[in-house]
Amino acid sequence: GVKHGINYNADGSVTFAFYDKDTAGSSHKYCYIVGDWNNWERKTEGSMYWDGSQYCWWITLDGFDADKEYRFQYRLGNASGADTFVSDPYTEIVYDQWNDQYIDGVPAFPEGAKALVSAFQINKPEYAWKHKDFKVEDKNDLVIYEMLFRDFTTSHDIEGAMAQLDYIQNLG
């Protein structure tokens, strides 16, 4: 079955599924997927289908270049007409218009996009491991931390994070 987030299909198409239910049990009235491929515009072909039994908006799209990265957002709305733009909470890549400008090599934030932007690529490049002899003793006994240096340390760099390794070790 389809999972929430980005689903890569065997035929090269991609299915997007977005859970939409708030604490009061309400959902938005419509959802469109907007992105690089449709100039960030709300178009009929980006209108997502509603599955009320799963509280999920979904759509399957094709025609993507498998080796190209595409950026997108979900554009949700209600009868009030005020749309909300959100990234996919399950995405592996997020572009941030407020912070990415300070990071070398990150593409310019797309015109027409708002807030955080998700990205996907069908043929994702394989990560080039630097230490090929690394072995995990017990993958069920791992503690993995993900850290954004600029938010974790006042110096905003790896040296500042390394100075805090005792703190991280004390976390467990």
Residues covered by each model-derived region:
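Aromatic- and glycine-enriched glycan-recognition loops and surfaces
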Residues: 53-67, 149-172
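Hydrophobic core residues within well-ordered beta-strands of beta-rich domains
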Residues: 12-14, 70, 143
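Extracellular/periplasmic catalytic domains that process cell-envelope and extracellular macromolecules
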Residues: 25-26, 65-66, 136-140, 169-170
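Core domains of carbohydrate- and sulfate-ester-processing enzymes
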Residues: 72, 76, 80-131
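Aromatic-rich carbohydrate-binding modules that target alpha-glucans
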Residues: 13-67, 77-99
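Non-catalytic, glycine-rich low-complexity segments
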Residues: 1-26, 107-110, 133-134
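Aromatic-rich, solvent-exposed beta-strand/loop patch
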Residues: 129-143, 148
